[in-house]
Amino acid sequence: MQIQKKHIIGWSFLGIILFISYYLLGGFTEVKIELKEQEKFYITGKKFIGESKDATLDSLVEATHQAYTEGKLSGTFSICFFGNPDEADTVEVLVGTMHTEEITPPKNYVQESFKAGTTIVASIEAEAVVAPSATETNEKIEGFAKENDLRLKDIFIEKYEDDFKIVTVVPVEQNR
């Protein structure tokens, strides 16, 4: 009987620690969605076209993030998907940094410009391990667009503003 009591206390204590950790990492934080006007911006990085599960994409993200952390790329680390990544087997992705000024890209990098306009912005402040998946966030964005009679451009941009803040920006074409 004494061993069972110790197990119950031990498991309860572990459960409390896990609950508190989940809370502190932002596990109960909701995605905030709003309509915002976005000024013209640029993304400088490297492009990938292929399967989303291709290891080459993972390597590209890691290498580009390293260049960003080493100061070779300025701005906000971002991943731009041309088309909804949840709806296609083949993806076109630009991995790099977002900035408001046009720059001369480093060797082997490209720069895309994005016009000013209305965007749907979804933000979450949570550690990536407990944050909603990109698929869940994209579904919420699409639901928001439908509720507000908005048509999305097929561009999904994930900005990693802080360790605990991920922002997804999706340009809006026009009202239906």
Region annotations inferred by a language model:
Residues Q2-R176:
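A solvent-exposed interaction/effector surface
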